[in-house]
UniProtKB/Swiss-Prot annotation:
Region SAY, annotated ranges: 1340-1573
Comp. bias (Polar residues): 67-81, 189-199, 485-494, 759-769, 828-844, 1053-1080
Biased composition (Basic and acidic residues): 525-534, 744-758, 936-945, 963-972
Tissue spec. comment: Widely expressed. Highly expressed in ovary. Expressed in nursing cells and growing oocytes at all stages of development and accumulates in mature oocytes. Expressed in the nuclei of syncytium blastoderm of early embryos and in the nuclei of different tissues of late embryos, larvae, and adults.
Entry-linked Pfam families: PHD
Protein name: Supporter of activation of yellow protein
Gene name linked to the record: e(y)3
């Protein structure tokens, strides 16, 4: 839902990521103008989850900002080339820079979908004094346009060869109120950074004009829904993941009671780096804000335009448009900063949408060799903020140098801020009206955590006041000074280590009201408080800032010189959720290369990752600084990219671009962001130039996803920025405590970092961020409006503040994706949790975090903590409080964590902040005790700086965030918010900011945990940070932070929802009073980390108020949650959901999940992710405490809803109606199907009901008096009756008092209306294990049914109805599921089978039955809809397509499978007219034309005439050919319409009369029948005669039999055979193989015929019954088969395997067919590898092929895998029919074949006589018969095998009992067998009787052939025959006896599976030599060795087929 919402918002405003991205890019482009094409390389982050690494190598004059996201190296190279090209031309003019920004844009491959011809890249029309000067955004702008309304071509930013011309982001303010940000994509012009030169008008890329009009009026309503770009989800994820991305511009954010929310526009460029891309023109029109002074946010946009030139980064085409180039990010940052340039406190400033441009191109190598620093391959774009103040131009240049060591480049950002007065001469007068804010440049180096970038604000307080104004000053790009101001905030914060959280926090304070726009996070505090533009450059600014404030001032001066460039407000176009992902994180805004390279180098030496404000050229040219920046950039990139927000508020804004944008729109100044940025810069500045050595940061993906978010890098980056700031501060300002603080801060940062890593799973940046936050907090104190960024404190402040916004924007994006939490937990450093948290929660947590991080970060011990404290209260506070860790204690400024967003104002308000913190603490009744020791330390410090302890900070942060960013205009609002913060009501207002809230919460949580761990343990600290940050932010943005925190914990789900809500709802602007009212006093709760993420584990404010604060932030956000839940309909049941938001009192204050005030929210949020957060939304006010905890009902509902009630085929879930009917109308809100939930929570609800006064008097109906009531009336009152509103006590009391008159099975008021929904249908027992439906029945409750049907006594009316009492377990289960009320359970419930009830209803109550059926149907549909809704909430834009593709793929697979099965298994089709089965020609048969067919027919005819064998490869005749030649097939059929028959037969009228076409008129002519019969017999005779050589007698008999057989049988059989042939043909080969042992027919001997006949008769009868064929005469048995062979004629005259005739088998030898009795298919025995001996036996019974084979005993062909096949006769038996457990190992022989060929014994022990003889001769003892029986299983038949000399098939030659095998001479075996045959006959007969007694059940008389003969009978008739036939066979065979082998095979018990036997024609072919194992494997079932062990089983029928034995 969050994603969807965000997308919707983006679509609406096109501003989600794109606006800010565009603004940033323009700013970057403008500032880049000085710095050649550094921005040209900005890469757009491809994936929302990818961290945008700001990798920029800043050329001497060129600044490169590169966000290395997931861009390919080639793209990076292209970007580098483009950057280098840009670097080549360093023209200082701002206009040129702006043009270059446009160039960069075109260079930058933006994934802009739609391209419209864009106006020529003319300099943005001179911005009206107030209006944002047109700012050109770099390619990132085009990238950011991806999802924007202007879907400019994905190729935005000329990803092609040349550096991308940054899109000019023109912010034309028609009036000061209106800010128009126009993103112009200019064609890639000369790589020159000069905007004018490099960007000819013709060069402009096509830009689709995107116009956003922001109403000037209502702060809450003012926010235009942000449209996310086409890639909004991606963009939002990217931007929110990267704070950098979020360049929430506070442009034009006037502190107003009703600030405008400027939609955040995220433009993502997916274009290939080199290809010029069309960047949509983004025009953001901000209606004039009431406060004129604040209205000049244009300067920021101008600045953005200036930096935009450089900011242009190639966007990665493949990447999502969501990311714009880092340059664009920087430009957006600049624009934010400029927007806040106007005096933040007094004048309400218009908020200028944050323009964020994300480039997907990986900026991993912003290696364009910089002219100045070729050694540093990677350039960091220089960010120059030029502030033209009255008569004074201040240029702040932030140069981000790539740390070659870190291998990351940081874009150089240049922000030119000209006060309106300072703008071009024409505009100078206009600009004069507004003070010139001194832009604060904060550059965060994500690359190197160790390096910090320092933002130096050259101008002192005066600029702070005019900061917002500055953006407008120059129509030329010159006014860009603030361009990156808002962004810089987040950047610097990131560098500082508190990252965007601080700035973000500050932003939230002012932003609170405006935070409605999901993606737009613009901190008013940024615009207000940061007079100096803090450029939160993600790329660590080169030490240039660190060089000397003088250098920074020089850069300012240079910028002033360049003041002509229009100030462009940077609008963060990237969605705030992923602050770090968007390229904006790496701002490429460089107003010019004015900053002297020396300065930049010095800065680099200082390793001030963030150059505060070095002269633009210096910054641009200082590439050495890039390396420190690189580290920071690495951190930033690794961490969620943070928008470069010049203004401190940007800390929040950068982190939460949406919030920042909103704040900007609502008028919150970017001042706070600027301050933070400055602070960050100051802190980072001191970093030595060593960073330059660091390698450019390779592209770091900023993942919006919780785990994906590059939090670690982010945290590191923050730390680095802090270090850089500290270094800079120390180096430049030589701040004594700066070094110490830096060291301490580094320690703190490290600790935080580690802690964060522990808590969040991210190590590196974690500590960095907190230091930044701390620094920022310190700077907040020191960095008042009056303080200059150059002042270390101010720098730190600005940097810190700027940092949090960046982080926030990214964080928000993550949160929107619900990744924030995971992100924080996974990448605590990346997210810079402490900073990020403050950003989310407000300045407080960010400040605290910053301090903590500093303290923890050993690298940043010297960071001046006080400046971080100076960070605006909102920013520092939120952050500071949670982040305030013991480690933080070292940084003094950390204590002063006061949010820095409004630093300029914050300074003034510093005292007020601490006082407000105290007041807020008092109001909220926050116990600071739980803050922790470090926080206590922080408390003192922060209290001083109005940051105080996390609680104080939260309060302070809220107050200050409100005050500092919005202090001037929104001060009361802030106070209210503070109040609100304490109050749960905050939740209600926050819904508007839900998404922001989520991202904030996640960011806060993620950020906070490490600092908190230091202080309270990461979870507590995070909780505090989240809460504080949430509070400040939620209060300022009124975002449901509770939801956020829960969402952060569940970062993947709820956060996104919340963000969405925030975006959609304007409730975030709810009056603080409401928020206050909503908070209920709740005990302080410590949030424990959520299951979803450690981030969630945050300590709630210590006191009930703190929990309230947490709740306040959470509460403030909770309404958001509610809204979010409502909007998101996260609750599956929206019906009750609405109620939840109503009672804010219910608020998160009561942590349901051990989350303290937020606990509920979090749990509810967690559940909200699943259930829509109803719990959190449910008002605490509701008296549902007795029920489950607040969230309980929602949880119960969720459980109940998730609980499938399957009754029969119907799923039964109680309806909302049912709920309403069953339960009292208590205020509790249930989800749709929560009736169960209500019931479910009966304990809770009933308690609630009891506790609540009855809403309506409950009648004591007569049912109480009913005589028939089953049980006591007391319990009779059920929760179901709660609907009547009478309390349970009253009911119970009345029940006791009233006499029982009637008995009713259910006691319910008579007037109660029971609907179908009241019937519980359930399955019992509940599903278990793998077979859920096993032993389950569907039941109903008799009492409920009786009530529904209106039956007084169901038992009496239906006495015979089966019923059962419900046991305790079932009753409890029913109650839990809410299916049965407690009252009913107490009365006693009876279960009846649902089927019976349905039958009764159908028979007797049809209307009720129909009603119930309809109810079930509708319920089922509702369930489906609910599931779809639940799925739809999280379904991304592409899911529909994915589903379609999956469906297509599934259909394709199924069709393929179906067709394959048709070809393989269902080949045949049956003609229903003739019942003729048509089969496809075998594949072996060549396809031929009719001509070939006729030719083959001719040849065949000639061959037959000449008695010549037909050629083997001759095509077989078609079936119809033979069919029409045979009587069977010659049945006339009418032709169906359109049926075509190629061959047909013409009947004569006389013939037709004999056929019953309609009615048979004549009898068939006798002559015709005779002819047919004769033809048949002749055909068969000739056929058989040809192949009868082996058995002439048999053939003769067969022929005679055929003649005697009536024709009907053959015809019928042949038809049946044809019908069955389909499957049989396929299986014939395998079956015959299994039956591959047979004795040649010749071996059957003379007596075989009679025996065969009798045997076959029995076989046939049984088989025929099996195959549904009637038995024939005894002679018909074998004769029938042959006769059928004849009748089948041509079609059946070929082998089913080789397709040859009988006289020619596969070996080209004549061979008689064997025919399957069932399918009539004929095969050559050799084709199925059937040995000759087996063939002889097969011919003696109705043999079936493998496909048709039926078990001889059960007559079933099912379960062929369980079938054993006799290796001698090929009969099949199921192992379970034989009593065997498994398939025997070796070969197996059936009972009929298991007899000794010498003695006729049917057991392997032999006959008793033989046993005695053998005993005498050493054989088995005679008296050992019983003992032998005991050893029976161990004895096995001895088999002899031989290889047939003709077929080479291994066949079974003989079987002997053990004594005979021992005694017989091997060579004389055959003779012995022959001699003993006569004697054996009686023995066999005797044995047959014994066999029946054998343990194994006899197969039955019918076992083998289905014979009905008794065993003796079966044996006796054939006894003589087998004996007679044996000798010849034995003689012919060479016997190889393998006793051991046979024994091994023979174990029937061990038989495993004989599946192979049935289907393998290879089994017999495998018979080789001994082949025992082979055979065992193949013929598993046939192992005869088992005969002994399984003898009982085999014996009974064993000898039945003696002929078979032969």
């Amino acid at each position: 839902m969050n994603d969807l919402r965000q997308q919707q918002m983006v679509a609406a405003t096109s501003s989600s990521g794109s606006e800010s991205g565009t603004a940033v890019e323009s700013a970057a482009a403008t500032s880049t103008a000085g710095s050649a094409g550094a921005a040209g390389r900005p890469q757009s982050n491809c994936s929302a989850n990818s961290n945008a690494k700001s990798v920029a190598a800043s050329s001497t004059s060129e600044e490169e900002q590169r966000v290395s996201s997931t861009s390919s190296p080639a793209q990076r190279d292209q970007q580098l080339n483009a950057d280098r090209d840009r670097e080549q031309e360093p023209e200082p003019q701002q206009q040129q820079q702006r043009e270059e920004a446009l160039q960069h844009q075109h260079n930058q491959p933006g994934h802009i979908t739609s391209t419209t011809a864009s106006p020529p890249p003319t300099l943005p029309p001179p911005t009206t004094p107030c209006d944002d000067a047109p700012s050109t955004t770099g390619a990132s702008a085009s990238a950011s346009s991806a999802s924007g309304e202007a879907p400019s071509a994905a190729s935005a930013a000329g990803a092609a060869g040349g550096p991308m011309a940054a899109t000019a982001l023109e912010v034309e303010s028609e009036e000061r109120d209106g800010h128009k940000i126009i993103l112009k994509l200019s064609k890639h012009a000369n790589p020159n950074s000069n905007a004018n030169e490099s960007q000819p008008g013709g060069d402009e890329r096509r830009v689709e004009p995107l116009r956003i009009q922001l109403p000037c009026g209502g702060a809450e309503g003012g926010l235009v829904a942000k449209q996310q770009d086409a890639f909004d989800a991606d963009a939002s994820s990217c931007s929110s993941s990267c704070a950098e991305d979020e360049v929430a511009t506070t442009l034009g954010q006037q502190l107003r009671n009703t600030p405008h929310i400027v939609p955040k526009l995220t433009i993502r460029a997916a274009n290939e780096r080199r290809v010029g891309s069309v960047v949509p023109k983004l025009t953001i029109k901000l209606p004039e804000n009431p406060a004129a002074s604040g209205s000049n946010s244009n300067s920021g946009s101008c600045s953005a335009a200036v930096s935009g030139a450089q900011s242009a980064m190639p966007a990665k085409n493949d990447a999502h448009l969501s990311s714009l180039s880092p340059a664009s990010a920087s430009s957006s940052s600049a624009s934010s900063s400029s927007s806040s340039s106007s005096s933040s406190s007094l004048a309400e400033m218009q908020t200028v949408p944050k323009l964020m441009i994300k480039t997907t191109l990986a900026g991993s190598s912003c290696i364009s060799s910089s002219e100045e620093l070729p050694q540093q391959q990677q350039q960091i774009p220089k960010l120059t903020i030029k502030t033209g103040g009255g008569g004074q131009e201040h240029v702040h240049t932030v140069i981000m140098t790539h740390d070659l060591n870190n291998a990351q480049s940081i874009p150089k950002l240049t922000i030119k801020t000209k006060s309106i007065e300072m703008i071009e001469d024409e505009q100078a007068a206009k600009l004069e009206q507004q003070l010139q804010p001194l832009p604060k440049l904060t550059i965060k180096n994500l690359c190197s955590p160790k390096h910090k970038v320092r933002a130096v604000l050259e101008e002192k307080p005066p600029t702070a006041a005019s900061k917002l104004a500055i953006p407008k000053p120059t129509p030329n790009p010159t006014p860009a000074p603030m361009t990156n101001g808002g962004e810089s905030n987040s950047s610097s914060q990131e560098f500082c280590g508190f990252s965007d959280p601080d700035a973000d926090i500050a932003a939230p304070a002012s932003d609170d009201v405006r935070r409605n726009s999901d993606d737009m996070v613009i901190d008013d505090s940024l615009s207000k408080e940061h007079d100096p533009k803090i450029f939160h450059n993600l790329p660590p600014m080169p030490a240039s800032n660190g060089i000397a404030s003088g250098g920074s001032k020089a850069s300012k001066a240079s910028k002033s010189a360049q003041s002509q460039h229009n100030v462009v407000d940077m609008v963060d176009l990237t969605s705030s959720p992923s602050p770090g992902s968007s390229p904006t994180h790496v701002p490429n805004n460089f107003t010019g290369r004015i900053s002297p390279k020396g300065l930049l180098i010095d800065c680099l030496r200082m390793q001030t990752a963030i150059g505060c404000y070095v002269p633009e050229e210096a910054d641009s040219r200082v590439r050495p600084a890039a390396s420190p920046n690189s580290n920071i950039l690495l951190s930033q990139l690794t961490a969620p990219a943070k928008s470069f927000t010049t203004t401190t508020p940007k800390s929040k804004s950068s982190k939460y671009p949406q919030l920042t944008e909103r704040l900007m729109a609502n008028g919150s100044g970017t001042g706070g962001g600027s301050v933070i940025a400055a602070e960050s810069e100051a802190v980072v500045g001191p970093l030595p130039a060593a960073n330059p050595a660091q390698s450019i940061i390779e592209s770091i993906e900023i993942l919006d996803t919780p785990d994906g978010s590059p939090r670690v890098a982010y945290m590191d980056e923050d730390s680095n920025p802090m270090l850089n700031k500290h270094l800079q501060t120390i180096h430049k300002l030589a701040m004594d405590h700066g070094v110490e603080q830096r060291m301490d801060t580094q320690d703190n940062n490290n600790e935080n970092h580690l802690k964060r890593t522990n808590s969040e799973g991210n190590e590196s940046p974690s500590s960095r961020l907190p230091p930044s936050k701390q620094r920022r907090l310190d700077n907040d104190e020191n960095d008042q409006q009056t303080q200059n960024c150059h002042d270390p404190a101010r720098k730190c402040s600005e940097s810190l503040q700027a940092l949090p916004p960046s982080h926030r924007s990214r964080k928000q994006k993550h949160e929107r994706i619900l990744n924030t939490d995971l992100e924080g937990s996974l990448f605590p450093p990346t997210q810079q949790q402490s900073i990020s948290t403050p950003d989310q929660n407000g300045a407080l947590s960010s400040e605290v975090e910053g301090e903590d991080a500093k303290a923890q970060d050993p690298l940043e011990p010297a960071t001046p903590q006080p400046p971080p404290v100076a960070t605006p209260a909102g920013t520092g506070k939120k952050r500071g409080r949670p982040k305030r860790i013991q480690n933080q204690s070292s940084p003094d400024g950390g204590g002063a964590v006061t949010p820095k967003p409004g630093t300029p104002q914050e300074e003034a308000n510093s005292a007020v902040k601490s006082r407000r913190v105290q007041l807020l603490r008092k109001r909220l009744a926050i116990d600071m005790v739980s803050v922790g020791q470090e926080q206590a330390d922080m408390k003192a410090k922060e209290k001083e700086s109005s940051v105080g302890v996390p609680n104080a900070r939260v309060e302070d942060g809220l107050a200050e965030t409100l005050e500092s960013p919005k202090t001037r205009d929104h001060r009361p609002l802030r106070a209210t918010r503070r109040t609100t913060t304490s109050t749960n009501t905050n939740l209600q207002p926050t819904p508007k900011s839900t998404r922001k809230r989520q991202s904030k919460a996640s960011v806060q949580q993620s950020q906070l945990p490490p600092p908190t761990m230091a202080q309270f343990g990461s979870s507590e600290s995070e909780s505090n940070n989240n809460n504080n940050s949430s509070i400040s932010f939620a209060l300022s943005a009124q975002i449901d932070l509770t939801m956020c925190s829960s969402s952060s914990s569940t970062s993947s789900g709820a956060a996104a929802n919340q963000q969405v809500i925030g975006g959609s709802g304007s409730s975030s602007m709810l009056p603080p009073t409401t928020i206050l009212s909503s908070s209920d006093p709740l005990p302080d709760v410590i949030f424990q980390p959520n299951d979803f993420s450690s981030i969630m584990a945050t300590q709630q404010l210590r006191s009930s108020r703190p929990s309230s604060i947490s709740c306040g932030s959470t509460g403030g956000s909770q309404p958001d949650c509610h809204d979010e839940d409502n909007y998101t309909s996260a609750l599956d049941n929206s019906g009750d959901e609405t109620a939840l938001p109503m009672p804010p009192t219910r608020g998160r204050g009561r942590g349901r999940r051990s989350r303290g005030g937020r606990g509920r929210g979090s749990s509810s949020v967690d559940r909200a992710v699943s259930v829509g957060g109803t719990a959190s939304t449910t008002p605490a006010t509701q008296p549902r405490a007795p029920r489950m905890s607040r969230g309980a009902s929602a949880v119960a509902k969720a459980i109940a809803m998730s609980r499938p009630r399957c009754v029969g085929g119907l799923k039964h879930q109680p309806d909302p109606e049912r709920l309403k009917g069953l339960f009292s109308p208590s205020p509790q809100v249930f989800e749709e199907d929560t009736r169960m939930s209500a019931d479910l929570s009966n304990s809770n609800q009933s308690m609630a009901s009891l506790m609540e006064p009855p809403l309506t008097p409950q009648k004591q109906p007569d049912f109480l008096n009913n005589e028939e009531s089953q049980s006591s009336m007391v319990s009779n009152v059920s929760m179901m009756d709660s609907n009547q509103g009478q309390s349970a006590d009253a009911i119970l009391g009345s029940a006791l008092k009233r006499p029982k008159k009637k008995k009713m099975e259910t006691c319910v008021a008579e007037d109660t209306d029971y609907s179908a929904s009241s019937i519980a249908e359930y399955d019992w027992p509940p599903p278990k294990g793998c077979c859920p439906s096993k032993n389950r029945d569907t039941f109903m409750i008799q009492e409920q049914v009786a009530l529904y049907l209106g039956i007084t006594s169901f038992k009496r009316k239906y006495p015979d109805l089966p019923r059962r009492s419900v046991d305790m377990e079932e009753r409890n289960w029913l109650q839990e599921k809410g299916l049965v009320s407690e009252k009913l359970c107490d009365l006693g419930i009876t279960a009846v089978w649902a089927s019976d009830i349905l039958d009764i209803m159908y028979a007797d109550f049809f209307d009720k039955y129909e009603e119930y059926k309809e109810y079930i149907r509708r319920k089922h549909l509702r369930e489906i809809e609910a599931k779809q809704k639940a799925l739809g909430l999280t379904v991304g834009a592409g899911r529909g397509l994915q589903a379609r593709d999956r469906a297509m793929l599934s259909a394709t697979k199924w069709n393929a499978y179906f067709n394959k099965s048709r070809k393989d298994e269902r080949q045949s089709c049956m003609d229903l007219q003739t019942f003729t089965i048509n089969q496809p020609q075998p594949r072996t048969a060549p396809t031929c034309t009719r001509l070939e067919r006729s030719t083959s027919d001719l040849i065949r005819a000639v061959a037959e005439e000449a008695n010549i064998p037909a050629p083997p490869n001759l095509l077989p005749p078609r079936d119809y050919d033979e069919a029409f030649r045979n009587s069977d097939y010659a049945y006339p059929l009418t032709v169906v319409p359109d049926q075509f028959s190629m061959a047909y037969r013409q009947f004569e009228p006389a013939e037709l009369r004999a056929y019953p076409l309609d009615t048979a008129l004549d009898k068939p002519p006798t002559d015709l029948m005779a002819q047919l019969l004769q033809a048949k017999s002749e055909a068969v005779g000739s056929d058989e005669i040809k192949t009868s050589a082996p058995a002439p007698k048999d053939l003769g008999q067969e022929q005679s039999a055929i003649k005697s057989v009536t024709v009907t049988a053959p015809v019928r059989r042949s038809r049946r055979s044809t019908r069955q042939q389909t499957d049989k043909v396929r299986t014939a080969s395998s079956s015959s193989t299994s039956s591959a042992q047979s004795v040649s027919s010749a071996s059957s001997g003379n007596g075989s015929s009679s025996d065969t006949e009798s045997g076959d008769e029995s076989d046939f009868s049984s088989t025929s019954s099996c195959s549904s064929s009637t038995g024939a005469s005894s002679g018909a048995g074998s004769e029938d088969e042959d006769g059928n062979e004849c009748s089948s004629s041509v079609r059946l005259s070929t082998c089913g395997v080789c397709l040859r005739s009988q006289h020619r088998n596969a070996r080209d030898m004549p061979e008689a067919f064997i025919r399957c009795y069932t399918c009539r298919k004929r095969v050559h025995p050799s084709c199925v590898d059937m040995p000759p001996r087996m063939v002889g036996r097969v011919r003696n019974y109705n043999w079936q092929c493998a496909g048709c084979k039926c078990c001889i005993k059960c007559r079933s062909s099912q379960r062929p895998g369980k079938m054993l096949y006799c290796e001698q006769c090929d009969r099949g038996y199921h192992i379970y029919c034989l009593g065997l457990r498994t398939v025997p190992d070796g070969r197996w022989s059936c009972e009929r074949c298991c007899f000794c060929m010498r003695c006729g014994a049917t057991k392997p022990e032999g006959l008793p006589q033989v046993a005695a003889l053998s005993q005498a001769s050493g054989g088995p003892s005679a008296n050992g018969d019983r003992s032998k029986a005991a050893r029976n299983k161990r004895l096995k038949w001895v088999h002899e095998y031989r290889i047939d000399h003709v077929t080479k098939i291994r066949e079974h030659a003989a079987m002997f009992c053990v004594p005979c095998a021992r005694n017989k001479p091997a060579k004389r075996q055959s003779a012995a067998g022959a001699a003993g045959a006569a004697a054996v006959t009686p023995v066999l007969e005797a044995t047959s009787a014994q066999t029946d007694d054998s343990p194994m059940p006899s197969p039955g008389l019918t076992t083998n052939g289905g014979r009905a003969l008794s065993p003796t009978a079966a044996l006796s008739p054939k006894a003589a025959v087998p004996v007679a036939s044996l000798p010849p066979v034995l003689e012919a065979t060479t016997v190889t006896t393998n006793i051991a082998g046979t024994i091994g095979r023979r174990q029937a018990g061990n038989a495993v599976n004989i599946t192979t036997m049935q289907c393998s024609s290879s089994s017999s072919s495998n018979f080789s030599g001994n082949g025992v194992t082979e055979d065992a494997a193949n013929v598993t079932a046939t192992g005869t060795a088992t005969a002994a062990a399984g003898a009982p089983a085999a014996t009974p029928i064993g000898i039945a087929p003696p002929p078979v034995v032969a």
